């Protein structure tokens, strides 16, 4: 299975002016933990890191330390996640029929989750890892006034990996460019094009490291795995 890792973001909410994936959790950069999970996932055979060239020297140094056995390629990132993934799709080997897309900042996803998504995408056109929402969600207007309360039983929190048929996803991205759609994940492009996206049960610990608090939580989770 082919894996694309969007890794081009700057950690503004992290309070830093460089790529947040270079910040460390337990003496390893965030991106290193993501790559180690991909290395350990038996279904993953190829990894594409979508990032800015200014980060490539640091990423290459990390790769040298990790000594991964799977092929890794660097792909030029865009100005948005959507544009970055589009670039990643164009860089896939021609043999790629399905692809997984996994946020570099979701460094706690386990090899088992990557494998489950890789196996499931062979039997559908699109999928996302997701978990049921536990909190009650309120829809509010621009003045902060509650408008309605959706039924929590129908709400799932989207995660990554997200998996897709490569040709269909390329078509959806092309349509998104034509229509001027701006989306925050690839499943939304499938939805806008009327293509079904299935759910694969995600992991409660599969958080996206975005804030300093997330760094502390990630360290706690990694420590707990060592002690289990």
From Swiss-Prot:
User: What are its E.C. numbers?
Assistant: 2.7.7.60
Entries under SUPFAM superfamilies matching the protein: Nucleotide-diphospho-sugar transferases (SSF53448)
Among the record's GO biological process terms, what is one?
A: isopentenyl diphosphate biosynthetic process, methylerythritol 4-phosphate pathway
| Keyword RNA-binding recorded | no
What are the coiled-coil residue ranges? none
Please give the InterPro entries that the UniProt record associates with this protein: IspD, IspD/TarI, IspD/TarI_cytidylyltransf_bact, ISPD_synthase_CS, Nucleotide-diphossugar_trans
Q: Which reaction does it catalyse?
A: 2-C-methyl-D-erythritol 4-phosphate + CTP + H(+) = 4-CDP-2-C-methyl-D-erythritol + diphosphate
Known pathway: Isoprenoid biosynthesis; isopentenyl diphosphate biosynthesis via DXP pathway; isopentenyl diphosphate from 1-deoxy-D-xylulose 5-phosphate: step 2/6
Supply the PROSITE patterns for this chain. ISPD (PS01295)
- Marked site positions, Transition state stabilizer: 13, 20
Pfam families registered for this protein in UniProt: IspD (PF01128)
Q: Which UniProt keywords apply?
A: Isoprene biosynthesis, Nucleotidyltransferase, Transferase
Is Nucleotidyltransferase one of the keywords? yes
Name the enzyme's class: transferase
Family note? Belongs to the IspD/TarI cytidylyltransferase family. IspD subfamily.
Record's protein name:
2-C-methyl-D-erythritol 4-phosphate cytidylyltransferase
| Organism listed in the record | Nostoc sp. (strain PCC 7120 / SAG 25.82 / UTEX 2576)
Q: What is the lineage of its organism?
A: Bacteria, Bacillati, Cyanobacteriota, Cyanophyceae, Nostocales
